[in-house]
């Protein structure tokens, strides 16, 4: 019975890990130190975004874009931080500032600045039921094309610094390789585990 319980608990914990996907740290612009990471928790249905970049400029990332290195086809989900704070926006498909979503679905958990580097952590539901928001998935190896941009100051304005990259939401790799001994085998009354 103890062996069955042990095996069952290992299988359940492995299943729980398999529901989490992540992009890992995606370098958007190495010279500026601009990165983003999306961690999707399939157990809680929450996605956590960590955006890191210079503290003296506005920063933006657009999700699931189809427009290559341009302003997208229109309607793509944008997360933008500027002098007014973190905003949920969407691309218009033209050379205009992204529209502010009527529903602000990102909740900023933290916004810290250390030595000129801003780190923003924000969360939201995987599916917000907002037609302007990207629906995150826990499916392994899901493609997530990204557009990025940042300005020359903290007020949203024209920018020349922008680009596109491809990312993938993959199952997080968790290294669990502890060495241990289990004895005696077979067990009669008492099982010993030595780490």
Regions found by a protein language model. Give the residues of each.
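Early extracytoplasmic/domain-onset interaction patches
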Residues: 21-52, 105
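Short amphipathic beta-strand and strand-loop transition segments with alternating hydrophobic
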Residues: 35-40, 107-113, 182-183
